Regions:
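FAD-binding core/adjacent interface of flavoenzyme oxidoreductases
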Residues: 40-127, 207-225
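Beta1-alpha1 glycine-rich phosphate/pyrophosphate-binding loop at the start
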Residues: 1-42, 46, 124-125, 130-171
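Short, acidic Gly/Pro/Ser/Thr-rich loop/turn segments
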Residues: 94-95, 137-138, 196
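A Rossmann-like FAD-binding core segment of flavoenzymes
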Residues: 47-72, 147-226
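Short N-terminal signal/transit or membrane-insertion segments
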Residues: 16-29, 87, 193-196, 205-206
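Electropositive phosphate-/nucleotide-binding environments in soluble metabolic enzymes
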Residues: 1, 34-41, 80, 107, ...
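Short, ordered loop/turn segments at secondary-structure junctions
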Residues: 19-22, 32, 60, 91-92, ...
Length: 226
C-alpha cells in the first residue's frame, strides 16, 4: 500500500493486485475479534484520497508471457494485464525448520498461528508453546494472549547476548516494547529450542532444550518460526 501511495503521485493509473481478500497482508490482517489496525486504517484513508488507485483482491500473477504483460488468475476467471512499471511486494516467507514430531496436528508456524487466530480459530484456554527465533515470537504470543489462550513458554533460540542487543533497539518499534512487556519475563527463555513434539494422534507435549537442561511441557499447540 505504501508503494502504491508513492507511485500515485506520478498521476498514472495504479492497480494493486492482492492474493488476499483484503489489503494489509499478514502484518495488518484483521479478523472476527481483531479490528483493523490503526496503521492499516491510515493507509486505507491515504489510498481513498487517490482516485487513480484501484484494488484487485483474490488475484495472483501466474505468468509473464511478454514484456509488459501479466497473466492474472482470480477465483472465477483469469485475465491479461498490461503495465509500464511493475513493483513486486511479495513480503517475507516464514521459515519452519523440521524436528521430530513436526507434522503432528497442533504444530504450526508462528505466523501460521497468528493467521489462524485472526481468521477466527478459537484458542481460548488452549495451552500454547511458541518457539524459534526473532520478534515474530513476541507478536504471536501477543495475538494468542489477546485470544485468551494460555501462553506457557516462549523458547528463543538466540543466545542471551543477542537478545539483549535486540532489546536495546526496541525503542525504534514501540509496539514491540508493548508486546515484550505483556509477556511475563519467566516465560521468555533465550538459548532454548525444540527437541521434539510428542503425541499420538495430535500434539500432547513438547520437549525443549533449555539452559537448565531438557524440559517437557504439556500443551495443545506448538508454534514455531525462524
Amino acid at each position: 500500500m505504501s508503494a502504491a501511495i508513492a507511485a500515485a503521485e506520478s498521476g498514472g493509473r495504479i492497480l494493486i493486485l492482492d492474493n488476499n481478500p483484503q489489503a494489509g497482508g499478514q502484518i495488518l490482517r484483521a479478523g472476527p475479534i481483531f479490528p483493523v489496525p490503526e496503521m492499516a486504517q491510515q493507509k486505507y484513508q491515504q489510498i481513498k484520497a487517490h482516485s487513480n488507485i484501484e484494488f484487485m483482491f483474490g488475484a495472483k500473477i501466474v505468468a509473464a508471457p511478454f514484456a509488459g504483460q501479466l497473466l492474472v488468475e482470480r477465483p472465477h476467471d483469469s485475465l491479461n494485464l498490461s503495465y509500464r512499471q511493475l513493483i513486486l511486494c511479495t513480503g517475507a516467507r516464514e521459515l519452519f525448520l523440521p524436528f521430530p514430531g513436526w507434522t503432528l496436528p497442533g504444530v504450526t508456524g508462528a505466523g501460521g498461528l497468528q493467521a489462524l487466530i485472526k481468521a477466527g480459530t478459537p484458542v481460548k484456554n488452549e495451552r500454547i508453546v511458541i518457539a524459534g527465533s526473532g520478534p515474530l515470537l513476541l507478536a504471536s504470543a501477543d495475538t494468542a494472549k489477546k485470544a485468551e489462550a494460555q501462553v506457557l513458554y516462549v523458547a528463543e533460540q538466540a543466545a542471551s547476548s543477542s537478545v539483549r542487543k535486540f532489546a536495546l533497539q526496541l525503542w525504534r518499534w514501540p509496539a514491540k516494547i508493548i508486546q515484550a512487556l505483556s509477556l511475563p519475563y519467566r516465560l521468555y527463555q533465550p538459548d532454548s529450542y525444540v527437541v521434539e513434539a510428542i503425541g499420538q494422534e495430535r500434539l500432547e507435549r513438547v520437549r525443549l532444550q533449555t539452559p537448565k537442561g531438557i524440559i517437557e511441557i504439556e500443551c495443545d499447540r506448538l508454534a514455531c518460526g525462524f
